[in-house]
Amino acid sequence: MFEVVIGLEVHTQLNTKTKIFCSCATSFGEAPNTNVCPTCLALPGALPVLNEEAVKKAIAFGKAVNAAINKKSVFNRKNYFYPDLPKAYQISQFDIPIVEKGELFINVNGENKRIGITRAHLEEDAGKNIHENNFSKVDLNRAGTPLLEIVSEPELRSSDEAVAYLKKLHSIIRFLDISDANMQEGSFRCDANVSIRPKGDTKLYTRVEIKNLNSFRFIQKAIDFEVKRQSEAWEDGTYEQEVVQETRLFDTTNLVTRSMRGKEEAAEYRYFPDPDLLPVLLKDEFLQIKIPELPDEKKMRFVSELGIKESDAEVIISSLEMSRFFESLISQNLSPKLCVNWLNTELMGFLKGELTIENSPVDAQKLGDLIKRIEDGTISAKAAKDVLAFVFENTNVEIDEAIEKLGLKQVSDDSAIEAVIEQILNANADKVAEYKSGKDKLFGFFVGQTMKEGKRAFNPAKVNEILKAKLG
């Protein structure tokens, strides 16, 4: 039996307005090579100037993961040649990063586990190579975008743990608002270092790096395939020949990893301090940066103060947008439990395909108006589902207007309900006698008949109250 050893390197693009060492914009999707300047293009004499906002965002992350913030950190040149790297070196941090020795807690199968974070360092992103129609093109818009590279300890033992760690990290980054962490646009990318060893062995064996994984599903599939490949090689006696220190790519069509190139050692990059950048010396006020409430803290508050289930709170804190939507709901002085049900179950049931909580046709104010009408007895919970479906398709219609159009306003007038109940009881005298002789289950029959006659417009609570009084 084997133990899996996984360490993850996450590159997250910081959401600063300008690049890390120049004033070019970081906006995504612009025409190729328009967000560039002499610094981005590595023209002679162009000097880098560090973006203060990038430093602040790195510090905020460090505080969120209980890490040490180094008051002095150094930028280094990482030397390698690639077409999308015009300087032929990347400005990064090596031996003295801005953040180190952090931690993050995950829960897998009901068990809590601490995962160490070795370091988080600032660096610049490279440009982008585009290969099409037998041509290779280079777009340098992305070159110089600030990155925070977050390196975990090799303490993850399965693909499930790796995905749980990444989801937790992704959530923290979003709640800190230091990155949009959009995996499809490449602002949250992961490299996975995977190796195996016999259970009980503490030695670290040959690791393989899988590059640029950009979805949680592909991360899980890539790790699972690589573990299977290495395990089979060990069992077949071909481990030393087939498992070498290398960089592999994940084939998302066939769900396999493929060799890309040999894995470089740190010495091959010839790191040395960048002579154009002074060491970063942090003043005390930088270390006092306030960070917002984090997902786990929100979850605990929702459970303790609002009395909702932990499982429901987990769904709410699953994204920053979901959390904001929920807090907007409860700010309207509504029942927290009703808010949870109508957000987590009813509204989310409508959000499919391209629709997310962020672009939901029904916003928090409109859903809150619907919940108010349930609370004040204007409509029943069952009728409210029809109203939600209607306003979901007819986005310009307000809740009260939808209730009127659909004719779903509840009747709470005692005399109107009593008249229908009298009619039903008189028409079912035999069942009334059976009920009074002990067949309590017939109460549901009387409720159903009354609601049917009332065309679902009767207030169920009133129906129950009057029926109980009539039947004795």
From Swiss-Prot:
Its EC number is 6.3.5.-. It is an enzyme of class 6 (ligase). One of its GO terms (biological process) is glutaminyl-tRNAGln biosynthesis via transamidation. The keyword ATP-binding applies. Coiled coil: none annotated. It catalyses: L-glutamyl-tRNA(Gln) + L-glutamine + ATP + H2O = L-glutaminyl-tRNA(Gln) + L-glutamate + ADP + phosphate + H(+); L-aspartyl-tRNA(Asn) + L-glutamine + ATP + H2O = L-asparaginyl-tRNA(Asn) + L-glutamate + ADP + phosphate + 2 H(+). InterPro entries: Asn/Gln-tRNA_amidoTrfase_suB/E, Asn/Gln-tRNA_Trfase_suB/E_cat, Asn/Gln_amidotransferase, Asn/Gln_tRNA_amidoTrase-B-like, GatB, GatB_C_1, GatB_Yqey_C_2, Gln-tRNA_amidoTrfase_suB_CS. Keywords: ATP-binding, Ligase, Nucleotide-binding, Protein biosynthesis. GO terms for molecular function: asparaginyl-tRNA synthase (glutamine-hydrolyzing) activity; ATP binding; glutaminyl-tRNA synthase (glutamine-hydrolyzing) activity. Belongs to the GatB/GatE family. GatB subfamily. Allows the formation of correctly charged Asn-tRNA(Asn) or Gln-tRNA(Gln) through the transamidation of misacylated Asp-tRNA(Asn) or Glu-tRNA(Gln) in organisms which lack either or both of asparaginyl-tRNA or glutaminyl-tRNA synthetases. The reaction takes place in the presence of glutamine and ATP through an activated phospho-Asp-tRNA(Asn) or phospho-Glu-tRNA(Gln). Heterotrimer of A, B and C subunits. NCBIfam families: gatB, PRK05477.1-2, PRK05477.1-4. This is Aspartyl/glutamyl-tRNA(Asn/Gln) amidotransferase subunit B. The gene is gatB.
